[in-house]
Structures are given as C-alpha cells and as structure tokens.
C-alpha cells in the first residue's frame, strides 16, 4: 500500500549512505547493511539488505513474514535455498554476478556463499522487512515443547542447542580455527530433496515478528 509523502517538505529524504547503517557484523568479510523507510523516508514499499559474505558463510535459515525477497548477486557466488511449502521440496539455485533468485513471502530460506568476497543485494517489497530467524526459533522455543512434540529427549535437545546464539544472522555462529577455514569443504550437496506430504499445508501466524 502506497503512503502519502509530501515531497515539498524539507524533511523529505532522497539520499542515504547504506554503508553507514550496519544491521549485523560478524567480521570484516561477513556483514549486512540495511536500507529501509526508517533511513530514507521517501521509499515506497521497497527496502534492501546489502550482504557481504566469505566462502561457506551463510545467511542463516529464516523467513520474512511481510515481504518477498529478490536476491541479486553482484560479485562472487552463492546458493539460494528455499523450502516450497506447497510441494515440501527444497529448491537450490546457484547464482553468479548478474543473476537473481526470488524467494516468495513467508518461505523458509537461506543463502551460502560459494566464493570469497561474495556481495549480494536482497531487495524487498516492503518499506521495512520483518524476519523470523531460525536461531531465535531454536533458542526461544521451550525445550519441553520441542521434546514433547517431536518425541525427543529433552536433555539431548538442550545439549544440542546450547551453543546456538540468538539472532545469529550470519553462520556458522561457532568459532572455527583459522587454519581449518582454507581447507574446509562444503558439507552440503545442493540437490532438491522431497517429502511425502498432505495437501493444504498449515500456516502459522502466531509469531513474534522482528523488525530490522
């Protein structure tokens, strides 16, 4: 929905330096800057994330409950993965400079850099994108609820998730010895996998939104 904007007002903003508005910084090679209506008030249902990643770093699994996301590769390379809730299929798209992958609103997705110095631009059809992060789901859902619903040992679940950092944004969130990084091979194979499923998937709207 378009908003009213008085373009004659001295408060109307037409320029902003996205480099000066970090959302998250893991290190100098892995960081996210943000532009939304809170930074540039003449934006009309558009916003973006300026994403820098080194090889094998991820934008962690997450979804945007209020916007679709168009991921454009500026440099380097990445795999954009998303779960299609209708087919229960994980779709993987390798993108290189000049290529895009589109993530529909509300779809669970993540990105992995396949090269160092990867630069991605994530464009949203919302003035400020909202996000639900996988790390927050893992960390803040009561362990008793997870254990009971999924028939797990609660103590094992607690142990497994104890190192999960809330709002990880860029993973892995654990520290790796520097000497291992250059030798590390990806542990992930990007071919779609399938589940047997029932039609008419359920959608849950009772969530706590995070606004960037």
Predicted regions and their residues:
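Conserved hydrophobic/aromatic beta-strand scaffold that supports enzyme active sites
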Residues: 48-52, 70, 92, 100-102, ...
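A short, N-terminal "cap"/entry segment at the start of jelly-roll beta-barrel domains
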Residues: 1-46, 154-212
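Glycine- and acidic-residue-biased ligand/ion/polar-headgroup-sensing regions
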Residues: 66-84
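Conserved short histidine dyad/triad with adjacent acidic residue
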Residues: 49-66, 94-97
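Short glycine/proline-enriched turns and hinge-like loops at secondary-structure junctions
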Residues: 63-65, 72-73, 113-116
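Short acidic-glycine-tyrosine-enriched beta hairpin
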Residues: 85-105
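Ligand-binding loop in jelly-roll beta-barrel domains
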Residues: 94-96, 105-132
């Amino acid at each position: 929905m378009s908003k009213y904007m008085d373009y004659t007002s001295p408060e109307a903003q037409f320029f902003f330096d996205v480099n000066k508005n970090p959302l998250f910084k893991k290190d100098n090679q892995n960081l996210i800057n943000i532009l939304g209506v809170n930074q540039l008030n003449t934006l009309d249902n558009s916003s973006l994330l300026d994403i820098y990643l080194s090889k094998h770093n991820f934008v962690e699994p997450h979804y945007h409950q209020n916007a679709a996301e168009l991921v454009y590769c500026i440099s380097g390379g990445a795999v954009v993965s998303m779960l299609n809730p209708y087919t229960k299929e994980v779709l993987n798209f390798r993108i290189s400079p000049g290529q895009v992958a589109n993530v529909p609103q509300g779809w669970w997705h993540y990105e992995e850099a396949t090269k160092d110095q990867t630069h991605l631009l994530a464009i949203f059809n919302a003035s400020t994108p909202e996000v639900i992060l996988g790390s927050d789901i893992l960390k803040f859902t009561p362990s008793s609820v997870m254990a009971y619903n999924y028939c797990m040992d609660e103590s094992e679940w607690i142990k497994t998730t104890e190192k999960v950092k809330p709002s990880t944004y860029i993973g892995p969130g654990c520290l790796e010895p520097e000497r291992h990084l250059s030798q590390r091979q990806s542990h992930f194979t990007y071919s779609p996998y399938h589940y047997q499923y029932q039609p008419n998937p359920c959608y849950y709207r009772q969530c706590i939104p995070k606004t960037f």
